[in-house]
Regions:
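Extended, small-residue-rich solenoid/repeat segments and analogous flexible loops
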Residues: 1-39
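Flexible, glycine/small-residue-enriched loop-and-beta-strand segment within the central core
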Residues: 17, 35-50, 55-124, 151-153, ...
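Sparse recognition of residues in long alpha-helices and their boundaries
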Residues: 70, 128, 145-146
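Short-chain dehydrogenase/reductase
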Residues: 75, 113, 131, 137, ...
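Beta-rich strand-turn-strand
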Residues: 116-131, 136-140
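Acidic, glycine-centered active-site loop in nucleotide-sugar glycosyltransferases
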Residues: 143-144, 150-152
């Protein structure tokens, strides 16, 4: 019981710190909650807009140089990463870190469930009422009322019994 109380207190403290540090670059609706290790990285030109009743599970990261918009009633599994920018890499004679960034907004509609370890890349738009399965890398436009999942098959090979010879 004591741990639940402390966990709720820590969540409130994290929300207060977010609002104090980035109040001009972040907008958070009512009913917002998050667990431990959630990081919002917002550069001077960045902005994050979060609707009402949004929940972030442990260790999610949002990184903004442009704009990330999240609708109402969204839930995020553990380890979700959202980026509105990527490194430029046009000139082989210039180090990548000196070439700046390509920035495209990210938009997540209302009532979306983003599964654990999803990566959302610059320019992605996820329509309302969509579910993104665990481990998916999202880019481009996902229509509303969609379910997106990885189609990966496990390859299971048999280990043969017998003797082993190193030569």
């Amino acid at each position: 019981m004591c741990f639940r109380f402390l966990d709720k207190c820590m969540g409130l403290i994290r929300m207060i710190l977010i609002r104090l540090k980035n109040s001009d670059r972040i907008s958070i609706g009512s009913g917002f909650s998050l667990r431990k290790g959630v990081i919002f990285r917002i550069k001077k030109t960045g902005r994050i807009i979060i609707g009402n009743n949004v929940f972030f599970n442990n260790y999610c990261t949002l990184s903004s140089i442009g704009e990330i918009t999240i609708g109402n009633d969204c839930i995020f599994g553990e380890g979700v990463r959202i980026y509105d920018h990527n490194h430029r890499y046009c000139c082989s004679n210039i180090p990548i870190y000196e070439q700046g960034y390509k920035v495209k907004p990210v938009i997540i509609g209302d009532n979306c469930w983003i599964g654990s370890n999803v990566v959302i890349l610059p320019g992605a738009t996820i329509g309302d009422n969509s579910v993104i399965g665990a481990g998916v890398v999202v880019y481009g436009r996902i229509p509303e009322d969609s379910v997106v999942k990885n189609i990966q098959e496990l390859q299971i090979d048999k280990i043969e019994r017998g003797s082993y010879s190193a030569h």
